[in-house]
Amino acid sequence: FLKILLKPFLKESSKLTLRKIALINFYINKPITEDNKDEIAKQYDWKSGHKLYQHYSFYSSRANRLALPDPFTKKKYNNIIELFEKVIEHLPDNYKQKAIDEKKTIESKYNSENY
């Protein structure tokens, strides 16, 4: 009985966010376009790919991927680092290095900015 009540909650919490899906697809060199956005979203149990496409377009820019949050807060910074860590977990080994290097770049920026 408890399992039935928790099933929707468990499924929802295990679902990848659109930001994670966008970054994963970027790092595995699988472009998200206007033509395939809905198809890719459905593969991850999302109904629409509109926001996914927006996130992918944002993260396609190196400057956007490596930017510290503005305005800066420690919480936003930690959220970015956590996003990268989760994405790295989902990447095949042969695609991880670029994401790892970019995460280190963000951490270096943070350390050099004296926040």
Regions found by a protein language model. Give the residues of each.
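Acidic, serine/proline-rich, intrinsically disordered low-complexity segments
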Residues: 1-39, 43-46, 50, 68, ...
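Accessory, usually C-terminal, subdomains that scaffold auxiliary metal cofactors
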Residues: 62-81
